[in-house]
Each structure stands twice: as C-alpha cells, then as structure tokens.
Amino acid sequence: MVQSVLSSTSHGSERADMSAASPQGFHCWTTHLGLADEGKDDFSMVISDRPCTSSVVFTKSLFAGPCVTLSKTSIEQTSPRGVLVLAKNANVATGAEGLRNASEIRASVARTVGIEPDALIMASTGVIGVQYPMDTIRAGLDGLGQGTPLDAHAVARAIMTTDTRAKVSERAVGTSTIVGIAKGVGMIEPDMATMLSFVFTDADVPQDTLNRIFRDVVDRTYNSVSIDTDTSTSDTAAVFANGSAGPVPDTEFEQALEEVCTDLVKMIASDGEGATKLIVTTVSGASSERQARVVGKSIINSPLVKTMIHGEDPNWGRVLMAIGKCSNEVDIEPDRIRVAFADIDVYPSSSLDQHDTVEVVREHLATVTVEINVDLGIGTDTWRVFGCDLTDEYIRINADYTT
C-alpha cells in the first residue's frame, strides 16, 4: 500500500506532515563552505549507514563536469551509498585542475566520515568556468563534524542555487519510506535525468530491479520536463536503497517512486526561473509514445505558447503552430487533431460561441496550473510533459546571473 507522507502543491506550499519519518539508516551533513552568500549552506551530503543498491543517470552534455566524470567512474567500481553536493559553483570547463580539485574534495570528505571515495557520487551546480576556491573549501571541510539523521528539507535547501524554495516529496510503501529532493529552475531540458535529484529509501530493492524501475521512472518524469530547452552540464539523478525496512512489492515501489519524482518535476517546472504558472500538456492518440513526447515538448518549449500563457491571452492558435512545427511526424493529419484547455474544447470547434470560448479559456489561463490536452487521432499512445510560462523575470535572472 502506497501512502502520501509529504507532497507539495504546484507552487511549493507544503501539505501533510512536515516532520514525516525519513527512511532508516541515512545520515546527512549540511554546512556553509563559502561558495554561497553568508548564511546559506552550500555543502550537503547524505550517506547510508550500510551498503546500498543504487541507480544513477547523468547528463549527456559534451561539457559534462568533473563531478560527473568522477561519479561515472565510481559506479563502474561499486554501488555508491551516498552523495555529496556543492552549490553555487558547477566546476565545469575547468580542465585537469577542476578534476583534481573535485577528487581532493571527495577524498577529504570520505576520510572524515570513514568510507571509500568511490562510495560517494559527487555533484556540483552553479556558475560554469570558475575553479573551486580550494583554500576556502579546505577550511570549511575541517569543521565538518558529525552527521545527523536525514533531514531532507535541510539538504534540499543546501543544494539550491536560483531556486526559490526547497523541493521535497515523500511516500510510504508498507514499512518503508521513499524521500526525494531536487533542485533546478533554469538550464532545464534533461536528456537523461534532471538537474539534480536524489531519492533515498530504506526499502530492499535488488540492483537489477532498481535499475529497471528507476530508468523507466526517469523517462516518464525528469525526461518529460522543460523550462528553457537548455540541458545542463551537471545533470545527475540517483536513487539509493539500503534495505533497512525490508522488501516491498515491485509494483508498489515503482508507483511510489514515480509519484515522488512526479511531485519533484512539478515543483521544478512551477519554480522555473521567473515562472508564475505550471504547464501540463498531455498528448494522446499518438502513433507512439515518442511521437506524443515530441509534440508535447514542442508545445511547452514554444516561446509564443509560454508567453501567451503568462499573459493569460487565449490565443490558442499558437498551440496549433507548435504542433505544426513537428513536420518530421509525417502521419500527423491536422483534420484529426483535437485541442482543449483542460476540458474546454477549442479546436476544431467548441460547444460555446467564439466569445464565450475565449472568455472561458482566459479564466483557465488565470489559474496557476494550465492544462493543454491534445488528441492526435492517430493511435493509442499517450505522453505527459511539464513546463512553465516565460516572463520578464526569467530574462532578468539570466542576464544578471554572474553579476
């Protein structure tokens, strides 16, 4: 049986029990090293007290950072039991020095907590092309201290960069708990995973099963979100299962894991840089899931659609434009297509007159979650994607990012 322990609304206001139990056997560390402004933690780490099964996916960017390189090597050697994250510096495009620095940091932390470096994957997020301030980091790590039982909200806050709120979701599956955290509000259209997302569970899940389930869930969630079409150099998503609570049915575990990751994806999209609205687009009647995703991504990535939604302007013809751009999908026939905003039909016709249709659509666009539903009328496959509106604030944030 799957139960919701903690979830968040699309704009981050949390409901349910903020002190919900965390999975057994995980400890965390959070501290301020000096990468971020004073008063904000910029270092975080979560480690299982016992060996884990784990599954990790990484960015496909050609400019993947040294932390991705280190972590890929580690998972070839062992099954990691934890993750450390530095925020406000991506350590990307930093060459051999950047790789040496990342290795030194991971080795130093591993010595402090008494594990092998390969037992930790490492992630880093922030400005590209800047070396770590190693003297500052070394001084900060000297006072790392003892870990505490996992506090997902503290870790989620420590990995934030331009995020405006922490992103945490939890589910209970039988006697086990799944908790997930994520960060990322810009440079987001993953091609494998997400910005940064880490899931911890005390369920006992065999390695092969965990790999299969996690990759399927990643495809349906993180690979189905886009804020600005840009794929990060540091994307990493991972799940760690330490088995402390015993086994759970595969189907229930997969359902709960997908619910956690879907919560996180919605939080990411609704917290997109400058965003005021979450866009959920469902494409049905496609000849394949791939086709449905292509059409859905074309809609949520269209600047004209995104600005239309931000301005609450019921110019639904822009959705047709975005579908029409998918010219490689040769079996799409415009005469078969149906488009609706939530349950409000707009194409090819509405039961309302034109004026009433416009006003009802305008009312829907005024909500914080905008639903666009497209039926291609070809086949039986469906896909759902998540995005956000495009605002002046997005431009301001990214025009001034390093200044």
Swiss-Prot record:
PANTHER family: ARGININE BIOSYNTHESIS BIFUNCTIONAL PROTEIN ARGJ, ARGININE BIOSYNTHESIS BIFUNCTIONAL PROTEIN ARGJ, MITOCHONDRIAL. This is Arginine biosynthesis bifunctional protein ArgJ. GO terms for biological process: L-arginine biosynthetic process; ornithine biosynthetic process. Pfam families: ArgJ. It catalyses: N(2)-acetyl-L-ornithine + L-glutamate = N-acetyl-L-glutamate + L-ornithine; L-glutamate + acetyl-CoA = N-acetyl-L-glutamate + CoA + H(+). Residues 1-11 have a biased composition (Polar residues). Belongs to the ArgJ family.
